[in-house]
Every structure is written in C-alpha cells, then in structure tokens.
Design a protein with these regions (language model features):
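Outer-membrane beta-barrel pore domains
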Residues: 5-8, 133-288
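Short, well-ordered amphipathic alpha-helices
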Residues: 112-125, 237-240, 283-285
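A short secondary-structure junction signal
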Residues: 30, 83-85, 93-101, 126-128, ...
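Outer membrane beta-barrel
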Residues: 1-92, 108-123, 133-134, 198, ...
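Short, contiguous, pocket-lining structural segments
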Residues: 64, 85, 104-108, 153-157, ...
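Glycine- and other small-residue-rich loops at beta-strand/loop junctions that grip anionic moieties
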Residues: 61, 105, 193
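Active-site rim elements
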Residues: 57-59, 99-103, 148
Length: 288
C-alpha cells in the first residue's frame, strides 16, 4: 500500500491528516503524481547515498517520500502554509508502526518533519504543468526540515534541510530546489563520524502547443558525501502530451548521468553504481 489517509478539517488554518501519505519535504515529491514535469523524480532525491562502510542496512536517500504518520497542516490568509508531522520514518515499504525508543536520545524513534511555505499570489496548485491552467500566475517559496531518529534499522540519526522555489506563469513552469542531509551513526554502530550530502536541481517546462509541453532539468548531487571530491550531474529533457477530454498524459524523457571532479578512477566508478549512464523513460499516466 503506497498511500491511504484521511483529513479532518477544523478550519482552513488547522487540519489533521492521519494515515500513509507524503512527508512534508520537497516540491518534487509533493506535486500530485499525475502532474509532474518528468516521469522520473530527480535522481538526487531518490538514489541511495554512498558511505565508506559496508553496511547493508544503511542506504538512506535525501528524499523521505511516503510514510505512516500524523500531520497538522493548514493555510493562513491564502499565502502562508505549514505542515508539521510525526512519522514512522521507515518509508513507503512499511505499513505498520515499527519504531520504539531511541537508546541514545531517549525520545521516540520517529521522523520529526516540518515544512513552511509562502505563496504571494495565492495558493500554488499541486502541478508542474496543466493545459487547463495556462493563465496562472502563482509562486511558492518554501523551507523544510526533518530529523529521523534511529533510521536505517536503528543505525543512524539523519537530519535533512531543504529549500524550494516554484513558479507557474501562463505557459511557463520553473522550479529549483536545494537540499542537505547529515547522517550520524548511533552509538551501537561504534562509528563516531558524520557524513554530509547535498543535492539540488533546476527544471522548467513550456507549452509549445495547447497540449504539448517541453521539459528540461539539470540535477546535481555529491553522492559520496562532502568528504570526497566528485559530483554527479544529470541533465534531462522531455516532452509531455495531454489527451483531450480526460486526465491521461503521455510522457517521455531522456537523462544522462555524468561524473566530474573525482580524485581517482575508483571513486568515479563507484559514484554511479546502480545508475544508468543513459536512460530513457516513456510513461502513460492517468491523474485522479
């Protein structure tokens, strides 16, 4: 089960959501699944980072995605939004509450997350391009953060911070995000070190015809942490066709995974393990 949740609306500024849903982190993730610019999310959000230890149970990525939890959220004056929640911290693959207490911090081993947004022109729709919204003028500026206590099978405490910006202006759509993750090991791992990872992307789309949208993205990440030289840079291009009279969309994209700045060939080879140098995706998607 990927998602199942309900909302209780006390008023516009105070709403309670309970179930399995998207955690409050990243414009890319929080966009409605059928409304994304590309069929694949930015690699810098979804790929597992690399550590200088062989720990099969420790494979975090910067994005937090879907999770079980409870969240208080609301909208103030149609301009200010907030989301504050507690989550299981185990991601989309787990459907039961499985966390206990932190041995190190003596607090519940949960994902503590929050997001705050400012939308100067009114509520930003959850879309990255829609042929029925070609006269919009909306902008979103947001900041989010989280601490996942005893994540990765009780092996690490992970801190994440993100900044996001998005703009819908008539036929144009633009977005940019930057994010940082700090991974610190729990005492039982006997590793007294912290590792920092940063990533980000910029992307844009334009409707060249009423139902045809062109897309471009540049994605970047230091997958092997700031302790080593080297970056992944991942440009992508795409095209979207929206069928008339239904919520059906045909998407196609191509992405290249490049590597630059590594100290040696071994680091360069390791940095894109599990990632295709050239990838193409075609997807027919129904939004509901």
């Amino acid at each position: 089960m990927q998602q199942a949740w309900f909302d209780v609306k006390f008023k516009e500024a105070a709403q309670l959501r309970v179930g399995k849903f998207k955690t409050p982190f990243s414009h890319a993730y929080l966009t409605t699944l059928g409304e994304t610019l590309f069929p694949q999310l930015p690699t810098s959000l979804t790929t597992a980072v690399i550590m200088p230890y062989t720990l099969n149970a420790v494979t975090p990525n910067i994005g937090t995605g879907f999770d079980l939890g409870v969240e208080l959220h609301g909208l103030v004056k149609d301009k200010f939004g907030y989301e504050i929640g507690l989550f299981n911290g185990t991601g989309a693959a787990v459907n039961t509450a499985s966390k206990t207490m932190s041995d190190d911090w003596h607090i519940p081993s949960l994902l503590y997350a929050g997001r705050f947004t400012y939308m100067p022109y009114g509520v930003m729709p959850s879309t990255q391009g829609n042929p029925n919204r070609l006269n919009e003028k909306k902008m979103l500026i947001g900041v989010s953060g989280s601490i996942n206590v005893e994540s990765e099978n009780e092996s690490t405490n992970d801190t994440r911070v993100g900044f996001e910006w998005a703009l819908l202006y008539h036929k144009w759509y633009f977005a940019a995000e930057a994010y940082w993750m700090n991974v610190g090991f729990t005492k039982r791992q006997k590793i007294n070190e912290h590792y920092n990872y940063v990533g980000g992307y910029i992307q844009g789309g334009y409707f060249v015809a009423p139902r045809v949208q062109l897309a471009a993205r540049y994605d970047i990440m230091n997958r092997n942490s700031t302790t080593k030289d080297g970056l992944l840079n991942m440009p992508a291009v795409g095209v979207n066709y929206f069928f008339k009279g239904c919520n059906l969309k045909l998407q196609a994209m191509y992405q290249y995974t490049g590597r630059t700045g590594h100290a040696n060939q071994l680091d360069r080879d390791n940095d894109n393990l599990g990632l295709a140098t050239h990838s193409a995706t075609v997807q027919l998607q129904y939004a509901f």
